[in-house]
Amino acid sequence: MELVIGRVVKAHGITGEVVVEIRTDEPDRRFTPGASLRAKRSRDGGTGRNYVIEGVREHGARLLVRLAGVNDRDTADGLRGSLFVIDSADLPPIEEPDTYYDHQLEGLRVRTTAGQDVGVVAEVLHTGAGELLAVKCDSGEVLVPFVGAIVTSVSLDDRILEIDPPDGLLDLGS
């Protein structure tokens, strides 16, 4: 499974740098000189092309990245909208208990401790107050806080996430 770690926003300057919106918790690990990244055009869904990073510098909340073979503004601008992706198999295993990568939770069936089917985790949202699971259900979408008091168990093998929702939480999607 491919995971997006960055998106090319635009070209920067005339020497071929690109502005990259960071979409990873580990930008220092992913965007380092000498590292190879695969860039895919978001609209054509092809296999993409590999690039070697020649240089990286911070630019506010974004990065300015120089890629081998991208030496002018026109070439850099041609990458606008491209997504930098990695294979989920390349991620290190998580050592901490009850900690998951977003892609591991997305697609899990959600049910209550009473056995009621709720829906499927569509997305993990990261907010200032913590993580929320966007659960797609028949009546729409319900946001479930990803906290131990509500999420009682996660079984990646069985693809099931069990919750003990407080009264009214599941009514919000109706």
UniProtKB/Swiss-Prot annotation:
An accessory protein needed during the final step in the assembly of 30S ribosomal subunit, possibly for assembly of the head region. Essential for efficient processing of 16S rRNA. May be needed both before and after RbfA during the maturation of 16S rRNA. It has affinity for free ribosomal 30S subunits but not for 70S ribosomes. Residues 97-169 form the PRC barrel domain. GO terms for molecular function: ribosome binding. Binds ribosomal protein uS19. The gene is rimM. SUPFAM superfamilies: PRC-barrel domain, Translation proteins. Belongs to the RimM family. NCBIfam families: 16S_RimM. This is Ribosome maturation factor RimM. It comes from the Bacteria. GO terms for cellular component: cytoplasm; ribosome. It is found in: Cytoplasm. The PRC barrel domain binds ribosomal protein uS19. Keywords: Chaperone, Cytoplasm, Ribosome biogenesis, rRNA processing. GO terms for biological process: ribosomal small subunit biogenesis; rRNA processing. The lineage of its organism: Bacteria, Bacillati, Actinomycetota, Actinomycetes, Mycobacteriales. The keyword DNA damage does not apply.
